[in-house]
Amino acid sequence: LVSVRSGAAISMPGMMDTVLNVGITDQTELVLATESGDTAFARDTHRRFAQLYGNVVLKANVDGFDNGQSADHWREEIRKATGSELPNDATGQLLGAVGAVFESWNSRRAKRYRQHQGISDLLGTAVTVQAMVFGNLDARSGTGVLFSRNPSTGDAEPFGEYLRRAQGEDVVSGSFTPEPLSAMSDAAPAAYTELLAAARTLEHAEKEVQDIEFTVERGELFLLQTRSAKLAPQAEVRTAIAMAREGLIAIRTAICRIPPDRIRQLMAPRICADARAAAVQLAGGEGACPGVGIGIVVTDADEAERLSDQGVAVVLARRTTSPHDLHGMISSTAVVTEEGGSTSHAA
């Protein structure tokens, strides 16, 4: 089985589509169950593929598939939603997945992200076809994201999250709330030690904070991808200074890494201690970025964009976010979610 991912020259986290478990069919599910010795794992993998392929490639907008349902049931639900067939052959699945990843370059969210980040629409993307490893296999398996330094504060300590018995999209999509990375040290201690060493090596080689996606399969570590991390303004400044002091980069390089707009963001409003003490706290959570957002609460991304265009400050509140919410997130002064961790693409 393989995963099909984007490979743009400039990384756009969460903006382009990914399809996992490509190649699983009724027949290969039986083979996977035999080789793994776990029919529940094989069924879970097939269910994950059907739902993701149906939504990403066929635009089915289906949810709630259950491992207790048959593959025929999943195919029928997708057929009713789209009028299209879920392929039950590896070649058809692969061709469909590759086409969908290419097409996602021109999706609304990808175009909006490039506009916001000043990235040319002419660059295009490659497609990466990569062998699958299975974080959903057993209790010694899982998936996560590791930053070689804290992306919110710039602290020179690894920061990340881990989700047991899961696949990578479960973490970065924000659909599940993972555990702190330290949970991995209990579940797979050898892989945890190896991961921290790999993060140091990659950061030293790239001379930038690394955002690493990884999977653990039966205690064995696999690095899926690494890229230069997106950092909060405070973290960007602290990291540049720290790397210059450590001799990783030159002082001139450190200065050039901080564009003027990031300095302006550092001057954004903060809550003073007296106001914090006097405030009535309605809810609490884990901050993905420092600063203060003020506005009326809206729960729909389109509504957030519409009100923002009228000059109204809004805070977007969602159970969880998806890349389809990007236009609303960009238009909001702050985003609040009920689920998802601080290493998700939305954060």
What are these regions (language model features)?
Residues 273-296, 310:
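Catalytic domains of riboflavin
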Residues 250, 294-304:
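Alpha-helix N-cap recognition
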